[in-house]
Amino acid sequence: MKKLFGLLGHPVGHSLSPLMHNQMFQLLDFDGYYHAFDVEPSQLEKAVEGARALQMQGFNVTIPHKVTIMDYLDMVDEEAQEIGAVNTVVMKDGQLFGSNTDGQGYLESLMDVVTTPFPTQDVLIIGAGGAARAIGTVLKREKVRSITIANRTLAKAEEFSGVLESSETSCSALSLKEAEQQLERFSVIINTTSVGMSPRVDDMPLSLERLSRETVVSDLIYNPLETKFLREAKQKGAKTVDGLGMFVNQGALAFELWTGLRPDREKMRRCVLEQLGG
């Protein structure tokens, strides 16, 4: 009997996770099936009860459930608690365990491009939502020199930067306009918002007029693969990191938690790229 895995979110019609995971099940000869379940917020508790009843072996959690899912799990690991969000759930002996692979998945994609030590990095994170919190938490763990949060709502950025502050990493908050004026002081800039995602591909989270060519510019969006934000950064001579690496890495880490098997990340990447027409 096939082992059932899935994705809980709303909406989920755009998700490429089923394609990626089902291909890996096939390649690794693992008797599993992954399905995306569209779950409205009011139905989340019932969906989790359904997952237990169906004896699902594990599932991913996406927008808008990453925070509220924590109320319905038996245990949440330390990093997910610190982040305040769960994106991966594993069933063990009838108990549901929550983890977060977003931050580590992103970190691994960033390490492919950032070659200087993390304690020398001054990072600007655009956005203050769940993805920003996952990334901020792992960057603090890596002891980056400073993290600045720029957000449309300054109060939210201030609250988040206060949570991140540590003895090794100084944290501050800026408005988007203030961040634009200080852009040249950052060595890494990360867009964690949905600004620039298909179909609004001409939008940018902020102006890159003051960007230094020494800066690494990263966007979590992977559709389109190269956002206008990344395109303009590249034109200014900066190194860029698209969102595909994080998407593949967080999926691969979840796959390992569920199955104990290590999927081929390059094949996962190619599978998603083909679907995106890349």
UniProtKB/Swiss-Prot annotation:
Pfam families found in the cross-reference section: SDH_C, Shikimate_DH, Shikimate_dh_N
Gene3D superfamilies the UniProt entry points to: Leucine Dehydrogenase, chain A, domain 1, NAD(P)-binding Rossmann-like Domain
One cellular component (GO) term of this entry: cytosol
Annotated metabolic or biological route of this protein: Metabolic intermediate biosynthesis; chorismate biosynthesis; chorismate from D-erythrose 4-phosphate and phosphoenolpyruvate: step 4/7
UniProt EC number: 1.1.1.25
Residues that bind NADP(+): E78, G127, A128, G129, G130, A131, N151, R152, T153, L154, A155, K156, L220, G243
Catalytic reaction annotation: shikimate + NADP(+) = 3-dehydroshikimate + NADPH + H(+)
Ranges in coiled-coil conformation: none
GO term, biological process aspect, one: chorismate biosynthetic process
Assembly with partners or alone: Homodimer.
Protein task: Involved in the biosynthesis of the chorismate, which leads to the biosynthesis of aromatic amino acids. Catalyzes the reversible NADPH linked reduction of 3-dehydroshikimate (DHSA) to yield shikimate (SA).
Protein's name in the database: Shikimate dehydrogenase (NADP(+))
Upper lineage: Bacteria, Bacillati, Bacillota, Bacilli, Bacillales
